[in-house]
């Protein structure tokens, strides 16, 4: 028999659609943490990746209009926290989530905040060397801002006691971990500056995770360190731990113990300095006593030497010594004067103008001879060129032509006659012959006929 009520029968499409609606309406938005794998970004700009943990995984999509708000580039293996909607891709029946927002999870988020704050403060110049204060040398009082129960305080006090037991230490106890720690650290720094009891501050704590050290990555703490008039030595964690406070502080020490080393003087060094000072004092006293003794001996000797006879003998001896010195000085002076005179005579002989005059005269004679020879040569050449020119002129001169029997006739205006048409009857002409001039009057003009050319 058939049951009284038939069960609902779904098609595959309807089943997938029903499941999708149930997921979207019943689950809504959820927060999911996991590790990114298989991250891809096609040309569309959408992100496709898988979120997984130790035992499961889920496919994810983050569309371009959502991923453009993400402030970091997701990497394979990165732990993230996403806000997403659960859905189902109906054509394939694939269950997936649509990511709306993404941020690093755990230390990843803290590291991102660390880098952002570091870049911000660096851009403002809080890390610049020009703002760093010099540490006092030596320090007369050290202030320590840390937990009163932490190992860092114990290490600092132990080092200071070993190196410089007489150095005063003022402790400003504060929390170094937790939500209240940044505010307490800031107040401790401000209090130390207000009381102005110490000339250097150590701000720090022992090692720990990034979350444990996060108070020293707080912007308020960084700005308080930067504003401190008292030089600040940061001593946070171990040598590999670097916080924002390290960048802002006037000096970064890798550990609290190292910070104590930096601000204190070595006791052994102090003892050596004291011993050196005592030795210098003893030497000064010995020198002073020896000097006084020598002075006393001199005075005593002078008193013994004050007898008149001794004084007279000393003066006689002094007079003889002075006479010898005077004679010796006069001889030396005369000798030096003679030598000086000889040098002057030699210099004068060297400066005698007679040899120079003789050389100059010889040079002038040579130049005169060369000039006369040059002029004679140039005159001979000029004469030869002139003779050649005269011969050439005579060869081409009209006078030579006239001497051979030719004549030149010119009109009254001086124009040379070349044709009979230039002459009129009754005109006066001038004819130049080889030995004179003939003036004549034209009585008739006859033009020669040109000979006919043979046919």
UniProtKB/Swiss-Prot annotation:
Source organism per UniProt: Escherichia coli (strain SMS-3-5 / SECEC)
CDD domains (UniProt xref): ExoVII_LU_OBF (cd04489)
Record GO cellular component, one term: exodeoxyribonuclease VII complex
Record localization: Cytoplasm
Keywords: Cytoplasm, Exonuclease, Hydrolase, Nuclease
Uppermost EC category: hydrolase
Family: Belongs to the XseA family.
Role summary: Bidirectionally degrades single-stranded DNA into large acid-insoluble oligonucleotides, which are then degraded further into small acid-soluble oligonucleotides.
MF (Gene Ontology): exodeoxyribonuclease VII activity; nucleic acid binding
A Pfam family reported for this protein in Swiss-Prot or TrEMBL: Exonuc_VII_L
Protein name as it appears in the record: Exodeoxyribonuclease 7 large subunit
Catalytic reaction list: Exonucleolytic cleavage in either 5'- to 3'- or 3'- to 5'-direction to yield nucleoside 5'-phosphates
Residue spans crossing the bilayer: none
PANTHER family in UniProt: EXODEOXYRIBONUCLEASE 7 LARGE SUBUNIT
Enzyme Commission code: 3.1.11.6
Subunit structure, as described in the record: Heterooligomer composed of large and small subunits.
Name of the gene encoding the protein in the UniProt record: xseA
Biological processes per GO annotation: DNA catabolic process
């Amino acid at each position: 028999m058939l049951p009284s009520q038939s069960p609902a029968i779904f098609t595959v499409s309807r089943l997938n659609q029903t499941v999708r609606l149930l997921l979207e309406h019943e689950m809504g938005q959820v927060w999911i943490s996991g590790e990114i794998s298989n991250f891809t970004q096609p040309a569309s700009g959408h992100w496709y990746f898988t979120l997984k943990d130790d035992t499961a995984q889920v496919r994810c999509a983050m569309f371009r209009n959502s991923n453009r708000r993400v402030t970091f580039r997701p990497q394979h293996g990165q732990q993230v926290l996403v806000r997403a909607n659960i859905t189902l891709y109906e054509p394939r029946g694939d269950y997936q989530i649509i990511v709306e927002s993404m941020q690093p999870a755990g230390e990843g988020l803290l590291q991102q905040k660390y880098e952002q704050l570091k870049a911000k403060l660096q851009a403002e110049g809080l890390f610049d060397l020009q703002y760093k204060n010099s540490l006092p040398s030596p320090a007369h009082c050290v202030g320590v801002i840390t937990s009163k129960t932490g190992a860092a305080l114990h290490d600092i006090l132990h080092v200071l006691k070993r190196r410089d037991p007489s150095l005063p230490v003022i402790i400003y106890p504060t929390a170094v971990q937790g939500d209240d720690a940044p505010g307490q650290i800031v107040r401790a720094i401000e209090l130390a500056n207000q009381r102005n009891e110490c000339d250097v501050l150590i701000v720090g704590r022992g090692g720990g995770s990034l979350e444990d050290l996060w108070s020293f990555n707080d912007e308020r703490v960084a700005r308080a360190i930067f504003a401190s008039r008292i030089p600040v030595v940061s001593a946070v964690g171990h040598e590999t731990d670097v916080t924002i406070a390290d960048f802002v502080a006037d000096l970064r020490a890798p550990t609290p113990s190292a910070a104590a080393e930096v601000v204190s003087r070595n006791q052994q060094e102090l003892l050596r300095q004291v011993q050196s000072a005592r030795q210098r004092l003893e030497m000064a006293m010995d020198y002073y006593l020896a000097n006084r003794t020598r002075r006393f001996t001199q005075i005593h000797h002078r008193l013994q030497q004050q007898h008149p006879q001794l004084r007279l003998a000393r003066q006689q001896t002094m007079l003889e010594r002075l006479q010898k010195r005077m004679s010796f000085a006069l001889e030396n002076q005369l000798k030096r004067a003679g030598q000086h005179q000889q040098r002057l005579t030699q210099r004068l002989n060297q400066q005698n103008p007679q040899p120079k005059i003789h050389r100059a005269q010889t040079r002038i004679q040579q130049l005169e001879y060369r000039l006369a020879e040059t002029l004679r040569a140039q005159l001979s050449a000029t004469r030869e060129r002139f003779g050649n020119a005269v011969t050439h002129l005579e060869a081409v001169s009209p006078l030579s032509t006239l001497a051979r029997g030719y004549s030149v006739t010119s009109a009254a205006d001086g124009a040379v006659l070349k044709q009979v048409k230039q002459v009129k009857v009754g005109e006066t002409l001038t004819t130049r012959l080889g030995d004179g001039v003939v003036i004549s009057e034209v009585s008739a003009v006859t033009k020669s006929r040109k000979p006919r050319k043979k046919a």
